């Protein structure tokens, strides 16, 4: 359900940013609150023609790639490098705020050569990870797939072991 919500949010945000507006001033980018250390951090290397990784599933990746292809196609690999770095940061569990701040800084710096990408797409992507990144961050943790059995799920009777024991017992043919 959360993935559908994220996908819907991305779709609505992209559709809204694609329609002409009469306002002349864009909202200030989210990156204005970043620490000087993050703003000066080394940018990740650009991997040419890598698989697009901005999004949580194939649908959101398709929407986000379409956004970049429409507004700043020459920056595709640069923006994707920010997403790859962000994914790695989440997997390393380096702290969600740190990962998101680094991602937003990367987007802001990588998109400077395109006004529409810098003023619209980068802040949109930044806001999306800040708004919906909790689940992805938690799922990226090393123990994300482990669960504990509830008392109702624990069963004293082990059917598989019982059947295996029956199959291992030699049958009497007399």
UniProtKB/Swiss-Prot annotation:
InterPro entries per record: PLA2-like (IPR053322), PLipase_A2_dom_sf (IPR036444), PLipase_A2_His_AS (IPR033113)
Keywords tagged on the record: Glycoprotein, Secreted, Signal
GO BP terms in the entry: arachidonate secretion; phospholipid metabolic process
Glycosylation positions in this chain: 49, 143
Region (Disordered): 137-174
Signal peptide: 1-18
Family under the similarity heading: Belongs to the phospholipase A2 family.
Protein name as it appears in the record: Phospholipase A2-like protein Y52B11A.8
Organism listed in the record: Caenorhabditis elegans
């Amino acid at each position: 359900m959360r993935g559908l919500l994220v996908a819907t949010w991305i779709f609505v945000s992209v559709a809204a940013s694609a329609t002409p507006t009469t306002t002349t001033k864009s909202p200030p980018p989210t990156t204005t609150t970043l620490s000087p250390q993050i703003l000066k951090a080394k940018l990740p290397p650009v991997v040419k023609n890598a698989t697009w990784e901005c999004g949580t599933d194939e649908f959101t990746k398709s929407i986000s790639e379409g956004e970049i292809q429409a507004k700043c196609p020459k920056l595709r690999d640069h923006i994707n490098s920010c997403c790859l770095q962000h994914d790695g940061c989440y997997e390393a569990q380096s702290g969600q705020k740190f990962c998101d701040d680094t991602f937003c800084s990367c987007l802001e710096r990588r998109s400077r050569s395109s006004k529409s990408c810098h003023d619209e797409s980068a802040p949109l992507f930044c806001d999306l990870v800040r708004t919906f990144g909790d689940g992805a961050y938690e799922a990226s943790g090393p123990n994300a797939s482990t669960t504990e059995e509830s008392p109702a799920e624990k069963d004293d009777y082990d059917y598989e072991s019982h059947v295996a024991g029956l199959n291992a017992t030699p049958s009497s043919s007399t």
